[in-house]
Amino acid sequence: MKRECAEAAYKLIKNGMTIGLGGGRTIQYLIEFINMGNLDQIKVVTPSMSTALACKSHGITVIPTWLTSSLDIAFDGCDQVDESLNALKSGGAIHTQERIVAAMAKQYVLLVDSSKLVQKLTFDYPVAVEVVPEAFSYVKSQLEKMGAQVAWRTGSGKDGGVMTDQGNPVMDAAFNTVDDVAALNRRISDIPGVVDTSLFVGIAAKAIVAQPDGTVTVIDRP
């Protein structure tokens, strides 16, 4: 399914475009399609080291995010997306960089298989919250007051919790029920010391959804 999804995404790319790419297996397939296709002068911006290395191995030009102010289109996966194109992007802990890439894109497209599409976000995944170190305890207490179970994310092979490339800790805030996704994201983002969250609300222009039978469905923003 991931390959079919990537093939549908490839058809949206034109010669000379500067595109944003996230991480994950579907993006790896998309890189292969770009490499095998007839497109010229494609440049890539990505927050993912694995994606950057894959592009380099296929001879695709990668430019730093800080040198770019706009992108023609950007593609990324997510943990879950709803029919209104609200998405949770908690897994990679690079959501701040991913949001920057999404904001620069004229069109931001999510690539998912049908198992990740829900009518309304269920929050089976926690909301990842990046915070400046000095605000760690304060932000944790504020999230707990909002009803979340909060933990500093840990990773295998590392002593202590996960830190971003910018040196900021990442908290996982688990919510049981959320009635208003946009309101939740605003409340968390307004806490002093919060850098960003993994909730993407009102950002995606469309989602390309791969079905088990090999077909793809495109959902446009309402």
Regions found by a protein language model. Give the residues of each.
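N-terminal active-site beta-alpha-beta segment that forms phosphate/nucleotide-binding
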Residues: 1-76
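Conserved phosphate- and dinucleotide-binding cores of soluble alpha/beta proteins
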Residues: 49-50, 56-222
